[in-house]
């Protein structure tokens, strides 16, 4: 445990003791937050604050603290005006030159995490100069020097910022003093282009030097810079020196290392950098010489020779032999030769390794025909390093003259300029042959190193087409065009100069059209990017399009491609530019006739040579239409139109090919389709039928009626002579101007006229399309079936000698006969109906039909037909001798049916399903709607169909009777399915020993079950997870399932699944059914005894787990009633049976399934008597024993009567109070239960004696039937004997005795275990040894009999001393037990608790006692706990034996009973009452309410706990005081937590404010006088006041300072008179407050400072003020209530002074409303003044005039003090005063200088008018003005003019203008008076 107030320990133990989330935050904070430095060393200074240091922390906000303020102070820095500090300034404040230290602590305000920095202050011991280099260049960037200070221990100071130093240039030992300033100088930062620290800038402004300076080199040489501390205290600290060298910035050209071949040479140049510019220096050099140094030879070199030779005059180096040497600068000044910054170069003399090529431009060996290139040959050594090629090297270069033309070549052969001539692949060669030696050497150095390079030459790149033009579309539709490329390597990179106009892909696809403009598309060769080709791309506006010539008529189904050209026409030049590609533009196709042509969407819009797009249209129906093509959504409407025609294909409908007729018969020939008359020239349409022999036939064109098709052409052809010929039909349009190439179609047929040769009679069948005909007519001698139920149509067909069927034989004479007219007959045997029918050949022929009438009888009949001759008068010659008759034998049968009609077949190869065909002709066609689902075998001999499944699916088996009249097939619906699902149906909760039925079904598709005959093919079986149940197969109940009987054997849970295997071996498993075998369901108690109105809850055990809902019912509801929770309430005396069932509803069947049930016997009684149950009546002192009230019988426990309504009250008393105390239960935790809960008490014995305990049980109402005989009270009493416990005489050494119950055990512990050897033994037992046993190790076991024993415990110490103690052990039975509660509850002084707080966790401890009240040290009792209800307490076993933990979850009283299961009489009952401990009641809380929460709970020290709220945005709560403001609707929970004692809560439901209630003090009103008090408008958001609970002073302060509830409320005011053009906000200032005293919101309305004009307007305003308020959170949600506040405006007068003569009378004009004017009080301060009564103005409403005059003018003039006229009003609390003065003599004749006329004269504008004009206008304006005001003025506004000159406000009565003239129009009336005149003061 970590105690409160314990110091923080910096260890990991603290981290792991935190909650996980706090530990995480702590860990994050520890890792993330740190200071910039851990330690700081500051210099001591006599000048405080001169050396600051900035301390920075990362993240968070910190509070800074210094532990040693006199040594180091710290000043936080706040950023952006916030209170958050992450930085602080350290300043050394030490005044003593000694080493001091301080610790800086930075504490993070949120996490309390501390950061530490150690700061030391010490004296500077020495200083030194720090520099990045010691060398400077002349006229180069300056060098920064910095001072570093160290203390005596060598530690470096953290900062020297702000300290003053003195920098100077000291004398060098090698230089004279006069040269010092010429070599180096010290710069200020302000003179250089560098940014110094801020403190340096400030110091330079004060002409001081800091710890950082700049130095700049002026000329070469050495210089010494010195620095010392300026402060006098450090005058003994030695100055620091640094020696700097100033050099020239010179370099060699080339400056890199050089590689030479033997004999080659190189010339060097020297340049220097001066002020950023490079200047070449001529030889010889002024200050330097060049030397070759450090010659290093390779193996085999001649030591006598150098590697290279140097010509100092020309700086040329010649390679002599292999090796390396250094070319270095040497300063001529000996003192400067140690300089390391002079340039040097290393020269390597090497052997050649190989050659290389380079080419320019492009650097690629992919060239272009016609281009000029520079080819360079490069030499490399064996290490691949490039060698310098001098002019004396010889390289031969070879190339093909066919491919290249050489234009330039150098002498050494390393540089060539060539031109590519033709394309192809060619190889160039180069060979290094020799190097010519100079210096008279005759032997050149020879080499033979060659290299070759393959070169690819391509033609120049050309892009096609030459340019691209695309239309711009405002919707951003892009065009895509692939550019064709010629030349180049074939691999290109593409780019666009303006990608906003055109973009190009890597494949050369150009996308453009979204933005107007032009761009250049560039294609670069990947092999050589310097080669490229380009085209221009234009995106222009489309403003013209046209459809190009095309074919205009076409057959239906054919497609016409219409080419479209689009243009951009220049508006100025009229030049038209055709677009390259506009195929991506969306085209809109419109026709004036819909459906003739449609857009062929599969057609590709593609550009062509003459057009940029095209549209494909398909002919869909005959007709003509005007097709208009336009661009969709374009900025200019571009369109073009053309006419198209579509026609059906020309064909011969009848006959299709050949027409065959008998002599004198007619064939009607029908042709259809072909072109229509061209709509623009219909006169050119033609059609014709031509023949070979005109005399053999007669042709007549048939004019079709209007209802026939218009494109059909019919001709009647009559046979005149026997024979055959060809007829040709042509149709089309002749060519014309408007249709130059029309379509013409033709078709041919043959016409035959012949004699009949044979006849055939067959029944007429309406066979379905696609089926074969009846096979019977093929055999003439076979019986042909016909229906015996319906009349049949017999058909006669006639054939010629070639077996061809005649189209028409109507000229023949026929006769019909029946052999058995009882079965069938003909009504007219000599006539025949000729019916045109297509017999399947596509040609319509005439057939002879005759109806055979049947009589619904089965049998056979012979039908015959005879041919008698032609119907004409004459017959043709040559009639054949063919048969003259035909016959057919018929059998009459019924229709076919299929059995069964529906079936579901399992998809398995071993399954064979048979379908029987009943009746019918016997000739059937078996068809299936699906072909691959089953294999169908038609067994003709058995008249059945066998189906073998092949694939799952649904099909319809159709049986067509081929030889009966077709009415439709006989069908069977068949479903072939695999196993889809296995279904188990059972009750999954089974009581042990019971049986349930298990039904197994196998489902196919669509949840259709299979028949159980397929189960053997499916290998269906059941599988159990465990053997707690058994299964037995039963007889099948139906053909679709298998049934099993399941028997529950053992309690537990198992899983049952059904398994099946399909044809592929795949296993299917049903959804596992979890089966629970549960113990028998039992209701507790078995018998319940109640008094009337008492409630007790039924508990249960056993049954399914988790337990389902128990349904309760009672047999007699007049005795008792039960609710759904099982709470039984007694009503009247009697018995009843309560039934409890666990049941559910089957989802499939909807039936109620009962898992288990039990019953309880309910007995409702009246209390006949009561008795006090005390387990013992003789007790020792200082013990406790519970007592409680019982009824007459043992079943009448406190459960029976403790929860009645009305409640019984229990009153206890004692005869002697000094013997024992009788206290209520839970008194140990300081609870004081009311009398209603005191059915149980605790006896505390105090002293020996005998006393009587009495209890009286009272009922409030005798009619409630609680007590027998309608008594109001019952009582009982018992005697208790208290005696002293046996003790030894020597009371200071009392031996302890161990008390154990029987059959228990106790482990003894001593204080010497582990330090000594401890053993124990039983010395003696009484009455025998079975009382107790001991194992020698301290474990005692009591037996089954009571008795006593003596126990000896011995300790053998290691130091040789033995200790022995002897104690007694008593084994006795347990007499009673007692429940006590924990923890203790504390309340404020003077307050008590009557119930446990809601939400509290409490512990019940069980203690056991013997028959005299002694407490047992161990226990062996099996306890049973019961509650009278389980909805108020959550209770369960504790973490220790014989303890119970409970949580108070709801208000109410729960009776807890506890008893020994073996001895039910040993029991204890306690009431547990739970109530709210937080006040006030929170049932009706509205938004805006302020709640002062309070509780009487405190801790043991009298301190309150901590308040918490679950949702702060609903109830904003101050956690310190417990006051909250309801800000939003919702539910929140307020918690009060006293750590270690109790945590309680209360739920707060905040309702939305239904309406705001406004009120005010009816005695108050609003006014606009400046000194008016604030008006208060009270607002309530709920039903009454908004303050809930009683507030403490601290809570009231929190409401005012922290919560600010007034921010919820917005106040508003508005004048009620809408004609008053003044907003109320200009007059009043309004804000909201919350009044804790009244408990409501207050709108304070105060008067603003007003102008005179505003006061004048308001003085006569007849208006009130509307006031209202709104909640910020619910603005606009609820209806707004407004309240009308009376408004009394203050009176107004603008006169402040009167100047009167002895005869003058002044008029005091006052504006105001009527009630104000009536309450005016006007009085004068001088007796020489007289004020007459007021009079109302007749012209202006609200104007009152008082007449003022001087009574004694002489005396008035002699007054020393001025006189006043005082005007006051009690309503508005106004007081105004007007000064009255006497006129002097000089002012008597100057009337015109005062008043309005003075203003007229003073204005230069008015002087332009004559006096006459003014006077003439005045009368007119007076009349007009008054008339106008009377009409429009609702609120009278009058301006009272001010007169006087030198004294503003003075007034002369005799010269004043009328009172209605206004010199300054008021605000409201200014628009009415501007047209009068304007007067300026």
UniProtKB/Swiss-Prot annotation:
Organism lineage: Eukaryota, Metazoa, Chordata, Craniata, Vertebrata
Parts of the chain that traverse the membrane: 1804-1824
Biological process annotations from GO: Sertoli cell development; spermatid development
Chain ranges of the BIG2 domain: 1078-1150
Pfam families given in the database record: Big_2, Ig_NUP210_15th, Ig_NUP210_16th, Ig_NUP210_1st, Ig_NUP210_2nd, Ig_NUP210_3rd, Ig_NUP210_4th, Ig_NUP210_6th
Positions annotated as glycosylated: 80, 344, 808, 1441
Family annotation (InterPro entries): Big_2 (IPR003343), Ig_NUP210_4th (IPR056897), Ig_NUP210_6th (IPR056898), Ig_NUP210_9th (IPR056899), Invasin/intimin_cell_adhesion (IPR008964), NUP210-like (IPR045197), NUP210_Ig1 (IPR055096), NUP210_Ig15 (IPR055094)
Gene Ontology CC terms: membrane
Principal subcellular localization: nucleus
Tissues in which the protein is found: Expressed in testis.
Membrane topology: Single-pass membrane protein
Keywords annotated in UniProt: Glycoprotein, Membrane, Nucleus, Signal, Transmembrane, Transmembrane helix
Highest taxon above the source species: Eukaryota
Signal peptide: 1-32
Compartment annotation: Nucleus membrane; Nucleus, Nucleoplasm
Family according to the record: Belongs to the NUP210 family.
Name the record gives this protein: Nuclear pore membrane glycoprotein 210-like
Deletion consequences: Knockout animals do not show any overt phenotype. Males and females are fertile, with no age-dependent decrease in fertility. In males, spermatozoa have a uniform moderately abnormal head morphology, frequent flagellar anomalies and decreased progressive motility. They do not show compromised histone removal or nuclear compaction failure.
UniProt xrefs under SMART domains: BID_2 (SM00635)
Source organism per UniProt: Mus musculus
């Amino acid at each position: 445990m970590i105690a409160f107030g314990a110091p923080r320990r910096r260890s990991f133990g603290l981290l792991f003791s935190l909650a996980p989330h706090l530990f995480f935050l702590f860990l994050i904070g520890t890792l993330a937050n740190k200071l910039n430095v851990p330690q700081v060393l500051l210099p001591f200074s006599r000048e405080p604050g001169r050396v600051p240091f900035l301390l920075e922390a990362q993240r968070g906000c910190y509070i800074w603290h210094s532990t040693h303020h006199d040594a180091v102070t710290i000043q936080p820095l706040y950023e952006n005006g916030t209170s958050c500090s992450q930085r602080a300034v350290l300043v050394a404040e030490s005044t003593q030159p000694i080493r001091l230290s301080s610790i800086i602590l930075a504490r993070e305000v949120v996490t309390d995490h501390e950061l530490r920095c150690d700061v030391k202050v010490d004296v500077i011991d020495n200083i030194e100069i720090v520099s990045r280099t010691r060398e400077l260049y002349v006229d180069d960037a300056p060098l920064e020097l910095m001072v570093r200070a160290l203390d005596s221990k060598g530690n470096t100071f953290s900062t020297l910022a702000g300290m003053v130093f003195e920098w100077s240039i000291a004398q060098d030992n090698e230089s004279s003093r006069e040269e010092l300033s010429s070599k180096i100088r010290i710069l200020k930062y302000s003179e250089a282009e560098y940014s110094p620290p801020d403190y340096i800038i400030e110091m330079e402004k004060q002409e001081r030097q800091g710890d950082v300076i700049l130095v700049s080199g002026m000329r070469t040489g050495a210089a010494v810079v010195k620095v010392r501390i300026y402060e006098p205290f450090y005058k003994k600290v030695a100055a620091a020196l640094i020696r700097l060298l100033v050099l020239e910035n010179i370099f060699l050209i080339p400056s890199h290392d050089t590689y030479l071949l033997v004999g080659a040479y190189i010339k060097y140049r020297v340049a220097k950098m001066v002020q950023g510019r490079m200047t070449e220096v001529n030889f010889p050099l002024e200050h330097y010489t060049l030397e070759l140094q450090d010659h290093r030879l390779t193996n085999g070199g001649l030591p006598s020779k150098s590697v290279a030779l140097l010509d100092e005059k020309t700086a040329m180096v010649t390679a002599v032999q292999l090796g390396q040497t250094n070319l270095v600068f040497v300063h001529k000044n000996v003192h400067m030769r140690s300089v390391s910054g002079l340039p040097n170069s290393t020269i390597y003399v090497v052997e050649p390794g190989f050659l290389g090529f380079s080419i320019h431009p492009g650097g690629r060996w992919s060239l272009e025909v016609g281009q000029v290139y520079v080819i360079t040959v490069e030499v490399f050594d064996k290490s691949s390093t490039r060698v310098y090629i001098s002019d004396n090297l010889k390289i031969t270069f070879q190339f093909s003259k066919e491919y290249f033309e050489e234009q330039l070549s150098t002498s050494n052969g390393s540089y060539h300029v060539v031109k590519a001539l033709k394309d192809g692949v060619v190889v160039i060669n180069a060979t290094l042959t020799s190097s010519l030696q100079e210096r008279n050497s005759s032997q050149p150095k020879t080499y033979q190193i060659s290299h070759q390079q393959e070169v690819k030459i391509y033609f120049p790149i050309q892009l096609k087409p030459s340019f691209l033009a695309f239309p711009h579309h405002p919707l951003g539709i892009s065009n895509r065009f692939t550019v064709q490329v010629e030349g180049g390597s074939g691999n290109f990179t593409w780019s666009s100069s303006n990608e906003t106009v055109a973009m190009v892909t890597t494949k050369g696809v150009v996308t453009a059209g979204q933005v107007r403009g032009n761009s250049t598309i560039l294609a670069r060769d990947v092999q050589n990017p310097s080669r490229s080709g380009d085209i221009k791309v234009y995106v222009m506006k489309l403003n013209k399009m046209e459809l190009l010539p095309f074919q205009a008529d076409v057959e239906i189904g054919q497609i016409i491609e219409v080419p479209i050209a689009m243009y951009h026409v220049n508006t100025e030049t009229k030049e038209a530019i055709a677009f390259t590609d506009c195929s991506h533009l969306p085209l809109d196709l419109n026709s004036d006739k819909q459906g003739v042509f449609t857009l062929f969407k599969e057609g590709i819009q593609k550009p062509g040579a003459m057009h940029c797009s095209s549209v494909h249209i398909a002919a869909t129906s005959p007709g003509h239409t005007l097709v208009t093509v336009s661009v969709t959504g374009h900025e200019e409407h571009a369109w073009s139109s053309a006419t198209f025609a579509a026609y059906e294909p020309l064909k011969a409908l009848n006959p299709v090919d050949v027409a065959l007729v008998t002599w004198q018969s007619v064939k009607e020939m029908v042709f259809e389709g072909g072109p229509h008359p061209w709509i623009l020239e219909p006169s050119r349409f033609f059609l014709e039928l031509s023949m070979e022999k005109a005399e053999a036939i007669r042709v007549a064109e048939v004019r079709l009626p209007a209802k026939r098709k218009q494109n059909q052409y019919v001709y009647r052809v009559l046979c005149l002579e026997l024979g055959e010929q060809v007829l040709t039909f042509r149709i089309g349009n002749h060519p014309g101007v408007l249709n130059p190439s029309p379509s013409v179609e033709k078709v041919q047929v043959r016409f035959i006229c012949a004699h009949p040769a044979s006849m055939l009679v067959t029944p007429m069948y309406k066979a379905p399309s696609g089926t074969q005909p009846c096979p019977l007519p093929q055999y003439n001698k076979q019986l042909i079936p016909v229906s015996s139920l319906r009349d049949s149509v017999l058909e006669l067909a006639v054939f010629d000698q070639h077996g061809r069927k005649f189209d028409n034989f109507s000229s023949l004479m026929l006769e019909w006969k029946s052999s058995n007219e009882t079965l069938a007959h003909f009504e007219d045997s000599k006539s025949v109906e000729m019916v045109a029918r297509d017999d399947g050949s596509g040609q319509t022929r005439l057939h002879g039909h005759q109806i055979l009438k049947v009589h619904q009888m089965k049998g056979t009949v012979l039908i015959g037909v005879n041919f008698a001759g032609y119907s004409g008068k004459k017959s043709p010659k040559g009639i054949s001798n063919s048969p003259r008759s035909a016959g057919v034998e018929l059998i009459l049968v019924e229709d076919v049916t299929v059995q069964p009609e529906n079936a579901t077949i399992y998809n398995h190869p071993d399954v064979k399903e048979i379908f029987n065909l009943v009746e019918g002709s016997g000739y059937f066609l078996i068809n299936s709607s699906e072909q691959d689902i089953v294999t169908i075998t038609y067994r003709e001999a058995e008249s059945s169909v066998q189906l073998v499944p092949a694939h799952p699916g649904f099909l319809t088996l159709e049986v067509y009777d081929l030889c009966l009249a077709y009415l439709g097939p006989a069908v069977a619906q068949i479903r072939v399915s695999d196993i889809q699902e296995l279904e188990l149906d059972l009750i999954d909760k089974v009581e042990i020993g019971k049986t349930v039925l298990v039904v197994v079904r196998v489902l196919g598709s669509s949840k259709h079950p299979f028949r159980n005959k397929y189960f053997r093919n499916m290998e269906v079986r059941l599988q159990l997870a465990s053997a707690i149940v058994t299964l037995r197969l039963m007889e099948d109940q139906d053909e679709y399932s298998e049934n099993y009987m399941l028997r529950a054997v053992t309690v537990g849970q198992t899983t049952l699944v059904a398994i099946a295997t399909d044809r592929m071996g795949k296993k299917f498993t049903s959804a596992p059914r979890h089966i629970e075998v549960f113990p028998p369901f039992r209701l507790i108690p078995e018998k319940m005894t109640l008094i009337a109105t008492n409630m007790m809850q039924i508990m249960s055990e056993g049954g399914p787990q988790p337990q389902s809902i128990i349904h309760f019912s009672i047999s007699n509801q007049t005795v008792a009633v039960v609710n759904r929770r099982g709470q039984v309430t007694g009503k009247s005396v009697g018995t009843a049976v309560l039934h409890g069932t666990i049941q559910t509803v089957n989802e499939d069947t909807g039936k109620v399934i009962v898992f288990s049930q039990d019953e309880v016997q309910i007995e409702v009684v009246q209390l006949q008597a009561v008795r006090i149950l005390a387990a013992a009546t003789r007790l020792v002192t200082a013990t406790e024993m519970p007592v409680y009230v019982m009824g007459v019988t043992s079943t009448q426990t406190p459960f029976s009567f403790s929860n009645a309504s009305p409640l019984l009250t229990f009153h206890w008393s004692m005869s002697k109070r000094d013997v024992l105390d009788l206290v209520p239960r839970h008194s140990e935790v300081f609870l004081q239960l009311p009398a209603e809960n005191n059915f149980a008490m605790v006896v505390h014995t105090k002293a020996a004696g005998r006393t009587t305990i009495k209890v009286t049980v009272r009922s409030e109402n005798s009619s409630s039937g609680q007590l027998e005989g309608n008594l109001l009270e019952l009582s009982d009493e018992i005697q208790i004997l208290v005696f002293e416990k046996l003790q030894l005489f020597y009371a200071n050494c009392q031996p302890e005795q161990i008390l154990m119950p029987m059959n228990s055990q106790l482990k003894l512990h001593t204080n010497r275990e582990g330090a000594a050897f401890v053993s124990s033994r039983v010395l003696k037992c009484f009455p025998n040894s079975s009382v107790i046993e001991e194992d020698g190790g301290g474990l005692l076991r009591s037996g089954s009999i009571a008795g006593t024993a003596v126990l000896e415990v011995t300790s053998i110490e290691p130091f040789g001393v033995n200790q022995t103690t002897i104690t007694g052990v008593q084994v006795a039975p347990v007499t009673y037990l007692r429940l006590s509660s924990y923890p203790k509850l504390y309340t404020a002084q003077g307050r008590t608790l009557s119930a446990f707080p809601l939400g509290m966790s409490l512990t019940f401890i069980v203690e056991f006692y013997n028959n005299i009240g002694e407490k047992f040290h161990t226990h062996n009792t099996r306890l049973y706990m019961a509650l009278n209800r389980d909805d108020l307490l959550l209770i369960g076993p504790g973490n220790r034996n014989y303890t119970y933990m409970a949580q108070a979850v709801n208000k109410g009283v729960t009776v807890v009973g506890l008893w020994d299961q073996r001895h039910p009489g040993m029991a204890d009952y306690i009431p547990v009452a739970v109530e709210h401990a937080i006040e006030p009641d929170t049932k009706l809380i509205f938004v805006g309410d302020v709640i002062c929460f309070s509780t009487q709970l405190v801790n043991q020290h009298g301190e309150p706990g901590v308040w918490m709220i679950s949702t702060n945005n609903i109830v904003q709560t101050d956690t310190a005081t417990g006051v909250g403001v309801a800000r939003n609707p919702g539910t929140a929970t307020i918690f009060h937590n006293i750590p270690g004692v109790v945590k309680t809560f209360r739920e707060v439901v905040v309702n939305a404010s239904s309406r705001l209630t406004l009120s005010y003090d009816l005695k108050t009103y609003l006014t606009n006088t400046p000194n008016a008090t604030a008006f208060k408008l009270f607002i309530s958001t709920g039903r009454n006041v908004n303050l809930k609970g009683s507030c403490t002073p601290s809570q009231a302060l929190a409401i005012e300072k922290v919560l600010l509830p007034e921010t919820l409320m917005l106040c508003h005011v508005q004048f009620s008179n809408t004609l008053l053009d003044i907003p109320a906000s200009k007059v009043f200032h309004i804000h909201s407050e919350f009044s804790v005293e009244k408990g409501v919101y207050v709108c304070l309305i105060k008067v603003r400072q007003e102008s005179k004009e505003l006061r004048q307007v308001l003085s006569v305003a007849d208006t009130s003020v509307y006031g209202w308020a709104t909640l910020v959170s619910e603005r606009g949600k609820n209806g707004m209530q407004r309240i009308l506040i009376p408004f009394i405006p203050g009176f107004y007068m603008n006169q402040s002074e009167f100047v009167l003569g002895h005869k003058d009378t002044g008029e005091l004009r006052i504006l105001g409303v009527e009630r104000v004017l009536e309450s005016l009080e006007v009085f004068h301060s001088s007796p020489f003044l007289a004020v007459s009564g007021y009079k109302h103005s007749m012209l202006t409403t609200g104007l009152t005039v008082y007449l003022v005059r001087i009574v004694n003018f002489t005396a008035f003039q002699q007054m020393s003090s001025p006189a006043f006229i005082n005007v006051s009003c009690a309503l508005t609390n106004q007081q105004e005063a007007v000064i009255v003065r006497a006129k002097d003599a000089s002012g008597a004749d100057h009337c015109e200088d005062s008043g309005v006329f003075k203003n007229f004269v003073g204005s230069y504008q008015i002087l332009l008018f004559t006096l006459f004009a003014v006077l003439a206008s005045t009368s007119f304006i007076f009349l007009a003005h008054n008339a106008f005001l009377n009409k429009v003025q609702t609120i009278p506004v009058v301006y009272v003019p001010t007169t006087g000159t030198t004294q503003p406000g003075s007034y002369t009565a005799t010269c004043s203008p009328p009172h209605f003239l206004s010199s300054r129009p008021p605000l409201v009336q200014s628009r009415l008076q501007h047209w009068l005149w304007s007067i300026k003061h």
